[in-house]
Amino acid sequence: MYYTRITQIERLTDEVATLYFSISLRSYPGQFVMVYVPGCEEIPLSLSSSNSVTVKAVGETTASLINAKEGQYVGVRGAFGSAFTPSKRALIVAGGIGIAPMKYLYEYLMKCGSKVSVVYGERTAKNLFWLDKFDRITVTTEDGSFGLKGTVLDALKLEKLDEYEKIYVCGSEGMLRATYDFLKERDALDKAEFSLERYMRCGIGVCGSCVIENGLRVCADGPVFNASELPW
């Protein structure tokens, strides 16, 4: 485990913040780290760059992180897990805090000269962030307060999916499964990669707490899976 100093905290919404570390990890988009705050449980977090995580306050540890102070030290293990497969023509589909690892992926692909489009969905406009980070982006909100009213599926209906080599998906379990079903109906599932999230204890495939229905471990076999690997 590394003990790293928080060099900067960028508050993005009332519930979301990006924490920048004093170390840069050897990592690829899609991988995650285990983060430890003294007095709290160690948790997995996707990297939003080689030296940052973007966190939504949903529990004790995440609340402690977004309310941390610059200069504070936290423990970090990783990076762990599988990464997204690069492609030249890519569609990124993100729901909610699922946009966090996708920014890392987007920046990586753009440096590789790829053509990248983004679909980003939230419940309401006040939850949106990073809209200025993406050149080609379609935004959806469920209440219609910004962009297209509806979910990411409504935006996907407007996309010519056959133009993309890869479709990368990250979001809530419900969003992932709905997108999986949609892509299956459109015969586009073979080009899709999904980033899953599960409760983890070890992060290295030993404890078995993150096993999915077919026996694969999100921490060691994922968190990025080809659609064909998922039991949906």
Curated annotation (Swiss-Prot):
Keyword flag Membrane: no
Gene Ontology molecular function: 2 iron, 2 sulfur cluster binding; electron transfer activity; flavin adenine dinucleotide binding; metal ion binding; oxidoreductase activity
An example Gene Ontology biological process: 'de novo' UMP biosynthetic process
Occurrences of domain FAD-binding FR-type (ranges): 1-86
Any single Pfam family the record assigns to this protein: DHODB_Fe-S_bind
HAMAP family: DHODB_Fe_S_bind (MF_01211)
Protein name: Probable dihydroorotate dehydrogenase B (NAD(+)), electron transfer subunit
Source organism of this protein record: Archaeoglobus fulgidus (strain ATCC 49558 / DSM 4304 / JCM 9628 / NBRC 100126 / VC-16)
